[in-house]
């Protein structure tokens, strides 16, 4: 337990051109021949035995065991796109796009969000801070041709991936920009799913959500303190808290 779960790694390169990790609060690179929290597929590769130029490596391993190595946001080894299978959904994403680092996290999050949201036919759903559309794709299958799911994301690479994957799905609408900029333009929202960064959502976004009066809000958070702060505002505006579920997606770390 707590080992061999991480699918994304940032590695440093030593003076001997070997991959390793930086010592705590130091620029010193400690060479390693394996990483105990990395997926076994990463440790079985030649990443820790090869010689590398430059200073850093980003390693990404998909659920289909594809491995990409990137430097300075450019792929230098492996496929340029990774295939991720989550339940019955398939995603094709760039290693630069955000994806959960725990290999099982996308599936656990998806199952819990879909359970709590209880999406129905013909609903209008917003997926805020939606990344490449982890929640958008399964929602689109539940709402039918008369429903709508609106993915709002500001990251260019995530939006490019989402456009490539969903361009032929007629009930998915992709909005490139901040939630502050785009949420106001979506009408008659039934359900909001949001997965913001650790600092939570802005007052403007909270106010937009309250003004839209969705029946259901599913808040995915990696920071209990900002979740509590934002939930307090919603509770003060006629919403009630029906359920809280904790998922340990960062094993051996303080985060939840």
Give the location of each predicted region:
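Conserved beta-strand signature within the Rossmann-like core of class I S-adenosyl-L-methionine
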Residues: 216-222, 227
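Conserved S-adenosyl-L-methionine
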Residues: 241-249
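A short, acidic, flexible beta-alpha connecting loop/helix-capping segment that sits on the rim
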Residues: 224, 248-251
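Conserved small/polar residues in nucleotide/adenosyl-binding loops
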Residues: 254-256
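Short alpha-helix
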Residues: 230-234
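Accessory RNA-recognition modules of RNA-modification enzymes
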Residues: 1-194, 199-205, 213
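Conserved active-site and SAM-binding loop architecture
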Residues: 237
């Amino acid at each position: 337990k707590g080992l061999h779960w991480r699918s994304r790694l940032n590695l440093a390169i030593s003076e001997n051109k070997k991959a390793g990790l930086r010592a705590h609060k130091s620029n010193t690179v400690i060479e390693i021949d394996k990483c105990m929290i990395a997926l076994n597929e990463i440790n079985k590769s030649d990443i820790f035995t090869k010689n590398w130029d430059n200073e850093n490596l980003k390693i990404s391993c998909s659920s289909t065991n594809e491995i990409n190595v990137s430097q300075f946001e450019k792929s230098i080894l492996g496929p340029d796109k990774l295939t991720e299978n989550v339940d019955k959904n398939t995603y094709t994403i760039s290693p630069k796009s955000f994806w959960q680092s725990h290999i099982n996290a996308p599936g656990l999050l998806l199952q819990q969000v879909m359970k709590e949201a209880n999406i129905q036919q013909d609903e209008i759903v917003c997926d805020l801070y939606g990344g490449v559309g982890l929640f958008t794709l399964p929602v689109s299958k539940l709402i039918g041709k008369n429903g709508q799911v609106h993915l709002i994301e500001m990251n260019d690479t995530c939006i490019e991936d989402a456009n490539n994957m969903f361009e032929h799905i007629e009930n998915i609408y992709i909005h490139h920009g901040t939630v502050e900029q785009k949420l106001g333009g979506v009408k008659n929202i039934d359900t909001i799913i949001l997965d913001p960064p650790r600092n939570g959502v802005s007052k403007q976004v909270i106010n937009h959500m309250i003004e839209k009066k969705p029946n259901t809000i599913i808040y995915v958070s990696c920071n209990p303190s900002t979740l509590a702060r934002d939930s307090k505002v919603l509770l003060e505006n006629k919403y009630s808290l029906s359920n809280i579920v904790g998922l340990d997606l960062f094993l051996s770390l303080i985060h939840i």
